[in-house]
Amino acid sequence: MLPKVLFLMGPTASGKTALALELAENHNCEIISVDSALIYRGMDIGSAKPSMEELARGPHRLIDIRDPSESYSAADFRADALAEIAQIIRMGKTPLLVGGTMMYFKALLEGLSPLPSADDAIRADIQAEADVKGWETLHDQLRDIDPVSAERIHPNDPQRLSRALEVYRISGKSLTELTQTKSAPLPYDVVQFAIAPRERKVLHDLIAQRFRIMLQQGFIDEVTQLKARGDLHLDLPSMRCVGYRQCWQHLDGEFDYDTMVEKAVAATRQLAKRQLTWLRSWPELNWLESGAEGNLVTLMRHCR
């Protein structure tokens, strides 16, 4: 019988953390965070990181493991999560993976393709060629070597277009060919849950309410301190997190406070929409309604 692992996924502001803490207090499980914002130290308010009181109730693994100046890939997450899962199981407990970064969940379940590392010289050659010939011409090149990727990647998406060409020039194989290679299935009985409100308006209201609370908790001061470090900028993955980018731009004088709030809430709602799009096509998923009384009982039944 394979060891059991629980996934609790859902859009932002759907109540994942509260339900996970309830389960941690009522069952012999440990929480692993699956969130690309919670990994960063010093980004507490805007990422809705669990409070000290909540962490005392249910410690979370894989939070505060990177400085905001550092990158962290899906491959990094997969390696770290597999190590944490194995350790929790050795302790005789059930791993509970909680979060909304769907790419991390997907990487953990399916593995990652063995793509070559970036090559700065080849990338520079591609950029120089694009400067002379234009990205449309390079897109035609991609269509010749990898029509599937060319259909998926728009000519106006130079980052992904460049990467697809770079992979081919390094390996001699197309991105499509390489991404068909998957890892072996996880050696666990993975039970997957998603939680979300039944009505979209409820989620939208929760998102707006939570951002207002973040502002009351000192979110602008948090971003001000990050900005004052001098080594962070908006091109870093950490500063692309929703809320942080909009607040940074407000502090730069790009728009006023009310516009910042409007843009941050809109960006968060767009994130939630993308998360729900992922989840609607997710196989073998058990749905829970945010705030429903029977959620804890349902989760505990699957823990046995």
Curated annotation (Swiss-Prot):
Enzyme Commission number(s) from the entry: 2.5.1.75
TM stretches of this protein: none
Region (Interaction with substrate tRNA): 35-38, 159-163, 240-245
Residue positions binding ATP: 10-17
Role: Catalyzes the transfer of a dimethylallyl group onto the adenine at position 37 in tRNAs that read codons beginning with uridine, leading to the formation of N6-(dimethylallyl)adenosine (i(6)A).
Classification via InterPro entries: Dimethylallyltransferase, IPT, P-loop_NTPase
PANTHER family registered for this protein in UniProt: TRNA DIMETHYLALLYLTRANSFERASE
Pfam families in UniProt: IPPT (PF01715)
Positions bearing the site annotation: Interaction with substrate tRNA: 101, 123
Family: Belongs to the IPP transferase family.
Reaction(s) the record says it catalyses: adenosine(37) in tRNA + dimethylallyl diphosphate = N(6)-dimethylallyladenosine(37) in tRNA + diphosphate
Top-rank lineage group of the source organism: Bacteria
Enzyme class: transferase
Protein name: tRNA dimethylallyltransferase
Chain positions recorded as substrate binding sites: 12-17
Record gene name: miaA
Alphabetic keyword roster: ATP-binding, Magnesium, Nucleotide-binding, Transferase, tRNA processing
Subunit structure of this chain's protein: Monomer.
Biological processes per GO annotation: tRNA modification
Cofactor: Mg(2+)
Gene Ontology molecular functions: ATP binding; tRNA dimethylallyltransferase activity
